[in-house]
Each structure stands twice: as structure tokens, then as C-alpha cells.
Amino acid sequence: MIGRLRGIILEKQPPQVLIEANGVGYEVHMPMTCFYELPELNQEAIIFTHFVVREDAQLLFGFNDKQERALFRELIKVNGVGPKLALAILSGMSATQFVSAVEREEIGALIKLPGVGKKTAERLVVEMKDRFKGLSGDLFNPVSDIPLASPASAESRASDPEAEAAAALVALGYKPQEASRMISKIARPEADCETLIRDALRAAL
């Protein structure tokens, strides 16, 4: 199993990043809350990974630290929650925000996440609350959220950031029409792709 990658960031195409380690390029799917904190292109990054093997694909999911990965691994154990939905959940909320929402039983906040209906939200609260008791670390005893950094350079800006941002939202589980509407609501000329995605997800909550 691939549990950790250390290498150079070659490409960023939310929510995927291409990282080269020892001459091999790895495509890694990351929650947007983790994606925002990646270094610039051509710089070194360390990513903790979870490897998923399916009949039709082998996928790597990446995180900035072990606690975020542990949360993802617990999420995909919940009935009805697969890796794609877990990725969408942790893109719509930071790991700390999600833990807080579950602890406070904020069903209304959870159902605003893509792919999460009332039944799934209720299941998340019931099952994840118990799972948190077996996990250690500051993340699982949240006090307040940590502001996210979202570095962006001219290299990482897309020629059409609005289209790229909408495509990223679709990859996270939003319908194309809904994704376009979300981006159009917060679009502004100077915003890059990562900023548009972050603002659209925040506005949806």
C-alpha cells in the first residue's frame, strides 16, 4: 500500500494533483480543503495517502496530515459513504469543521454538502460520533477551525478559471448546471480557480 508520497508537484487540476516521486508521476485526488494548502508548482510536497483498489481503477487519495487521512478512512466505513462522497464532504468542510458539525449534530449544515441527504447526514452523526472516540489527536477535540491558506501563482492559474472551477465541482459530486450556477454567483475577474472553488463551497454552506 502507498501510504506517503514525497515529491515535486508537476500539475494541479482540482481536485487532482500530479506529484513526481523517484521518477514516477502519481495522480492524487485531494479534498479541496487540503488542495488549497499545497505548495506552488515545481516545489516539493509531502502527502499522506490512502490507496483504493476497484475493479475498474486504482485510486490514490491524499491528505496534508495523518489525522485528515484517519478521518477519511473512518468516513468510508459509514454505510453509503464511498471514497468519492468522502472526498466531497471534506472538500465542502475542513476536517475540523466536519468534526464540529458531527459533535454538535448539525444536520442542517451536513445536508448542504454534495451527495448528502437527510438520512445520510443523520447516519454520519450517529456513526461518526462513536468513531471519534477511538481516534486521537487535536482534530478530534475541536475548539475552532484553522484558517486555510490558498496560495496561487500565475503558473497555477487556468486560462479559463471559471470553467476549471465548475469542472472541479462536478468532480466533487455537483450537477453541471448547479456547479455553473455556484461559480457564476461568486465569479470575479481577478479570481483564480482555487479561489473560485473555495468561495463557491463556502457560499453553499
Curated annotation (Swiss-Prot):
It comes from the Bacteria. It holds the Pfam family RuvA_C. GO terms for biological process: DNA recombination; DNA repair. Its main location: cytoplasm. InterPro entries: DNA_helicase_Holl-junc_RuvA_I (IPR013849), Hlx-hairpin-Hlx_DNA-bd_motif (IPR003583), NA-bd_OB-fold (IPR012340), RuvA (IPR000085), RuvA_2-like (IPR010994), RuvA_C (IPR011114), RuvA_C_sf (IPR036267). One of its GO terms (molecular function) is four-way junction DNA binding. Residues 143-156 are annotated as: Flexible linker. It is found in: Cytoplasm. Keywords: Cytoplasm, DNA damage, DNA recombination, DNA repair, DNA-binding. Residues 65-142 are annotated as: Domain II. Residues 1-64 are annotated as: Domain I. GO terms for cellular component: cytoplasm; Holliday junction helicase complex; Holliday junction resolvase complex. Residues 157-205 are annotated as: Domain III. CDD domains: UBA_RuvA_C (cd14332). Disulfide bonds: none annotated. HAMAP family: DNA_HJ_migration_RuvA. Belongs to the RuvA family. The RuvA-RuvB-RuvC complex processes Holliday junction (HJ) DNA during genetic recombination and DNA repair, while the RuvA-RuvB complex plays an important role in the rescue of blocked DNA replication forks via replication fork reversal (RFR). RuvA specifically binds to HJ cruciform DNA, conferring on it an open structure. The RuvB hexamer acts as an ATP-dependent pump, pulling dsDNA into and through the RuvAB complex. HJ branch migration allows RuvC to scan DNA until it finds its consensus sequence, where it cleaves and resolves the cruciform DNA. Homotetramer. Forms an RuvA(8)-RuvB(12)-Holliday junction (HJ) complex. HJ DNA is sandwiched between 2 RuvA tetramers; dsDNA enters through RuvA and exits via RuvB. An RuvB hexamer assembles on each DNA strand where it exits the tetramer. Each RuvB hexamer is contacted by two RuvA subunits (via domain III) on 2 adjacent RuvB subunits; this complex drives branch migration. In the full resolvosome a probable DNA-RuvA(4)-RuvB(12)-RuvC(2) complex forms which resolves the HJ. Has three domains with a flexible linker between the domains II and III and assumes an 'L' shape. Domain III is highly mobile and contacts RuvB. This is Holliday junction branch migration complex subunit RuvA. It comes from Pectobacterium carotovorum subsp. carotovorum (strain PC1).
